[in-house]
Structures are given as C-alpha cells and as structure tokens.
Amino acid sequence: MVPRLKEKYEKEVIPALMEKFQYKNIMEVPKLEKIVINMGVGEAKENQKVLESAVADMQLISGQKPILTRAKKSVANFKIRENMPIGCKVTLRKNKMFEFADKLMNVALPRVRDFRGVSSKSFDGRGNYALGIKEQLIFPEVEYDKIDKVRGMDVIFVTNAKTDEEARELLRFLGMPFAQ
C-alpha cells in the first residue's frame, strides 16, 4: 500500500512545485531523500540500561531497529572514552520515511504543549531541515507508564533541494506546520 504522504507528494506537491519554481523537467523537483532520527543519551556512560530503553523507545517510534552511535574521541570533561556508546540513530528511507513524516506532522507535533508551529529558520543552507523534539511522549506509540525518563531527539529531513527556499516549500506542501 502506498503511504498517504507519498501519494500526496506525487499527485499534489510535484505539480505545485513545478508551477511555483518553473521547473522544465519533473526530475528537477526536490524530493525527500531520507529522515534521520538521532537521540543522544548522555547518561549512557554510567548506566547501559538507559541506552537500552532509549533504543526501545526509538524502535517503537520509527518502526526500525536503531544503531548505536559511539564517541569519536575521548573527552575527559564529559567522562567519555573513544568508542563508548553514547546514543542511537535511525535512518528512514522510502515508504517508512513517508509514514514517519506523516505521523510526525499530523499526529505528534499537534500534541506538543503550546504548539505554535515549527521554526522556519532551521535550514542548513543546503536544503536540509533539522527539528528538535523535547520529549518522546508526543508519539502515540510511546506509553506514558512504560518510560523511565523523558528524552528528546533530533529529526533531520534530508532533501535533494538546491536551496533552502525550495526545501521550505517542499516541506510546506507536504504539511509541515511552520510558524508564521
């Protein structure tokens, strides 16, 4: 079954972007390449159980098993050594990516307290958008009673857009609730 957001992209977003940016070829239209969800778990250095529960939460949210991220080098002030596991991340592509984006924009973000829209300034200059989420409870899969600690995560939308303006329009047409 084709995800709802992918269908919307093909039927509505592509024609709208072609008209707005005057593309001559359908292959010029920017598209979502992947979504990377990253969770840094600072307490993992003392307690491995914390990391396991973070991995379990992320697996529920993304529907895919996360990989552990490790420290690149030792930092004495943070009490970490090289190669210590300090977080986890998931890279979503194709249908899982569209399903996650749909769930994030239409279910999870509206559940954030005092939500007025996401910042439209978080583009990196190359058409990628980063979004910070303060708590994993906004996702319907995570049950309040089952979590040990409220954890945040970063969600990065990687597009093949050439400019931030193109990427912003792509995400806006897909339904990203940008603050006015």
Swiss-Prot record:
What lineage does the source organism belong to?
Bacteria, Bacillati, Bacillota, Clostridia, Eubacteriales
The UniProt family comment states:
Belongs to the universal ribosomal protein uL5 family.
On assembly, the entry states: Part of the 50S ribosomal subunit; part of the 5S rRNA/L5/L18/L25 subcomplex. Contacts the 5S rRNA and the P site tRNA. Forms a bridge to the 30S subunit in the 70S ribosome.
What is the protein named? Large ribosomal subunit protein uL5
- Gene Ontology process terms (BP): translation
Q: Which organism is it from?
A: Clostridium acetobutylicum (strain ATCC 824 / DSM 792 / JCM 1419 / IAM 19013 / LMG 5710 / NBRC 13948 / NRRL B-527 / VKM B-1787 / 2291 / W)
**GO cellular-component terms in the record?**
ribonucleoprotein complex; ribosome
- Give a short account of what the protein does: This is one of the proteins that bind and probably mediate the attachment of the 5S RNA into the large ribosomal subunit, where it forms part of the central protuberance. In the 70S ribosome it contacts protein S13 of the 30S subunit (bridge B1b), connecting the 2 subunits; this bridge is implicated in subunit movement. Contacts the P site tRNA; the 5S rRNA and some of its associated proteins might help stabilize positioning of ribosome-bound tRNAs.
Gene3D superfamilies, A to Z: 3.30.1440.10
